[in-house]
């Protein structure tokens, strides 16, 4: 008589896989998440939360770009930075990379303590998705332009006090960040310089209000959106800006139309060097 093989279920066996609960969400393509190459630009408050969420969501290949050192005012909004990091003058990108490795030692984390504009022109080309976690409009426009040119999805986040926004840019299907800017924006365009004490800084922008709960909400929306993109759930993406007002308890989804005169869309006609677009 042939013996039948029975699958033995051990009590608690599903608790041995730390990603078991996430894998139970049917639309999440966990294998794609683990293969994806992710770039986080900005390692401050949003970068801390986004980085932590990425690692806990199963992303294994993460690169971080930030030119600044950690300062004391970061500590109320950056869960992964400590007082000793300030005292020793550590770099944001370096410390964030170090702390993400502590959360999951199997994660491959690289870091660059430079302005994104100082990296090679085709630096973004190697990534599958970019997360913008910046307070610098010039850097934001830089990653917007380069990500759009190479056909790489960009999930950009920003906060102001208890309000925040997430903009989703899927080339060439959606508007880009620059599409939503008007003449006033460009007239008032001013770079927010590093707080690291660089000698070449002569103009400073005022410090903006910020607090951790808003940062946490925006970062969560960014990473959830990124999971949808990597899992190819394009129909579930917002079209294409989420606005959050924590004081008024309001979420709004706004559609930003493509500006045909936007230089990124004019340049789109030339597809040389671009990556394959999402289907």
At which residue positions do the language-model features occur?
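Hydrophobic Val/Ile/Leu positions in short beta-strands of Rossmann-like dinucleotide-binding domains
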Residues: 40-43, 64
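Conserved S-adenosyl-L-methionine
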Residues: 56-61
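N-terminal charged helix/coil linker that caps or initiates catalytic domains
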Residues: 1-39, 72, 267, 274-279
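E1/E1-like adenylate-forming module used to activate ubiquitin-like modifiers
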Residues: 109-111, 121-218, 228-234, 245-278
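Generic hydrophobic/aromatic pocket-lining and core-packing "Φ" positions
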Residues: 51-52, 144
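Conserved acidic residues
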Residues: 113-115
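Hydrophobic/small residue at the entry helix of a nucleotide-binding pocket
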Residues: 46
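Glycine-rich phosphate-binding loop and adjoining beta1-alpha1-beta2 segment
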Residues: 64-104
């Amino acid at each position: 008589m042939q013996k039948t093989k029975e699958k033995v279920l051990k009590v608690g066996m599903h608790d041995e896989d730390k990603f078991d609960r996430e894998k139970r969400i049917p639309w999440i393509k966990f294998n794609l998440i683990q293969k994806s190459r992710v770039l986080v630009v900005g390692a401050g408050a949003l970068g801390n939360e986004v980085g932590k969420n990425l690692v806990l969501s199963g992303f294994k290949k993460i690169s971080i770009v930030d030119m600044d050192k950690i300062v004391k005012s970061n500590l109320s909004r950056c869960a992964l930075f400590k007082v000793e990091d300030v005292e020793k003058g550590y770099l944001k990108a370096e410390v964030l990379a170090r702390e993400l490795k502590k959360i999951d030692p199997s994660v491959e984390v690289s870091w660059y303590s430079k302005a994104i504009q100082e990296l090679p022109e085709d630096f973004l080309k190697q990534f599958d998705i970019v997360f913008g976690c910046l307070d610098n409009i010039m850097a934001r426009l830089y990653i917007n332009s380069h990500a759009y040119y190479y056909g790489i999805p960009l999930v950009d986040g920003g906060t102001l006090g208890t309000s925040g926004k997430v903009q989703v840019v899927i080339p060439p299907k959606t508007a880009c960040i620059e599409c939503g800017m008007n003449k006033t924006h460009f007239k008032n365009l001013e770079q927010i310089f590093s707080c690291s004490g660089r000698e070449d800084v002569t103009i400073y922008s005022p410090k903006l209000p910020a607090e951790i709960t808003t940062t946490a909400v925006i970062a969560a929306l960014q990473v959830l959106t990124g999971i949808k993109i990597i899992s190819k759930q394009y129909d579930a993406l917002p079209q294409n800006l989420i606005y959050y007002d924590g004081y008024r308890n309001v979420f709004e989804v706004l559609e930003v139309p493509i500006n045909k005169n936007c230089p990124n869309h004019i340049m789109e006609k030339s597809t040389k060097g671009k990556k394959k677009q999402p289907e």
